[in-house]
Amino acid sequence: MRIHYLLFTFLLVLLSPLAAFTQIINNPITCMTNGAICWGPCPTAFRQIGNCGHFKVRCCKIR
């Protein structure tokens, strides 16, 4: 029965970092810590990686 606890703990530790990379950026602080800017429409050299709290203000990062 202890092997179940060990397996559960191992899977929890193994899969927990993946959740951080799948979250959507939805505030200005997270956008800026990822090296991006909050802007209306993204310029051509940038790509959208999220939004900055409002659907019209996008989080744009250079390609």
Curated annotation (Swiss-Prot):
Signal peptide (residue range): 1-22
Tissue-by-tissue expression: Tongue, esophagus and trachea.
S-S bonds: 31-59, 38-52, 42-60
Positions of modified residues (Pyrrolidone carboxylic acid): 23
Keyword Secreted assigned: yes
Family listed: Belongs to the beta-defensin family.
Name the record gives this protein: Beta-defensin 4
Gene name, Swiss-Prot/TrEMBL: Defb4
